[in-house]
Amino acid sequence: MRLLIASLLITGLYTLAESSTLENEETQIYINKLTLLESPAPLLNDHPEFVQPIEELTRYEAPILVDDDGADLSVRAWRFSYNARGIIEMPNRIRSDQTAVIMVHPWGIDDGQGWRTPEPAGVADFCTPEKNHLAGKHTREVIDPLLKRLRPDVKLVMYSLIGPVDPIRTKLYRTIDYTPTATERKQAQAALTKALNTFKYTSEPLPSRFAISREHPVIDYFKQFEGLAVRNAPGFWQLPVPVTADITVHDDDVLIFDVEGYDKVRDFLKDNGIRHVILTGYATDMCFCATTAGYENLSKDFNVFLVGDATLATFPANSTPKYATNAHISFASLNQLVTQTSWIRKVEK
């Protein structure tokens, strides 16, 4: 049995080294020693209003994974492994000048800027005004303070948004291709305010009656009365979606247009010397993972740390996102490292 285990370990290490060598990267051997933790506190327990704390039967401590020379930022993180039968935590020490903080989809909806949920039955973002307001509270109380704390040290703070590369947002925010002047920003802000506040935020009403078959009424019912239907007035999704007013945007922060694709984002990050990404934003189960700046893309090229309490999942049929966020961030931890806001700290000299 020991020979078998040793053989598997050697084979695994050889395969890892061979794979890394093929990519022309310097290799090292990671000693995967797992030490059982005794009575650890729940994970993600700093903001239980927004994220249900994570508790698992077994938790381990592993050796440091990322250990940069000249590191000035500590990012403790964890992942889950069914094979290890538990959660594995490890310290990381990274260089902030090689780090980008990215917020996925901070939509400025129902936040006072003008873009708002169409009535009586329109949807956008978390899909009801009440849910959007709750997400705004989370942004103000959790994400914005984190960005303010990290911005002075990290290389980049970035936001990803939907919509075309329009002339308003390209002059309102710094983008991958252009940094607007103060005059351009002022003019763009006025244009944004006008565009968002002159649109008629109406939607189709709920259907009051419709035909259903006698044979399959359930099928017909959901075909004609969907739980998430496009009822917004034409032109709604063509409006220039701003970064939410709940974020304190700085002139050096960079806007990502999803429509331009991941390759452009990747190249921009690499051109700026980025190796690490601290990822925040919405929604954990959708945009946070699967859009242009989501972790499914970024984790192919960078050391990605998902900030588990700086994201919210969509929460249909619930008054709180805490359980949905717990479930989706837990699932992500099978293949991603998860940290939390209180675990991201300056390295003590």
Where are these regions (language model features)?
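Sec-dependent N-terminal signal peptides
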Residues: 3-12
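Boundary at the C-terminal end of the N-terminal hydrophobic targeting segment
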Residues: 17-19
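Active-site-adjacent betaalpha module
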Residues: 22-101, 106-125, 129, 140, ...
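Blade-loop segments of beta-propeller domains
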Residues: 133
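Glycine-rich, aromatic-flanked loop segments that form ligand/cofactor-binding clefts
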Residues: 158-160
